């Protein structure tokens, strides 16, 4: 039996492929008000989900975008790698 190669959602801009990902990441939670020890202990960062195309990634950062045309990118983000919990390439 021949195993089919997974096909992942992507786009091409100027002959470069950009793959579409679902990214789960921790968002910092802040509060400037007064709180008890119990309330303070209950603080947890929010687990967020972002979908978009990965522009670039290195040891420190992940850059994404969600909108584009033939030459420019919009809806851009830059995530510190330490905040990212999980990245999944989206299949077609």
Residue ranges and their predicted role:
Residues 2-92:
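Conserved RNA-binding domains used in RNP assembly and mRNA/RNA metabolism
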């Amino acid at each position: 039996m021949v195993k089919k190669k997974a096909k992942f959602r992507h786009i091409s801009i100027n002959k470069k492929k950009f793959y579409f990902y679902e990214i789960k990441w921790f968002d910092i939670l802040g509060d400037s008000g007064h709180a008890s020890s119990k309330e303070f202990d209950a603080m947890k960062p929010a687990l967020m989900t972002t979908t978009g195309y990965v522009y670039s990634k290195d040891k420190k950062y992940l850059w994404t975008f969600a909108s584009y045309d033939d030459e420019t990118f919009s809806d851009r983000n830059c995530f510190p790698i330490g905040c990212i919990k999980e990245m999944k390439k989206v299949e077609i």
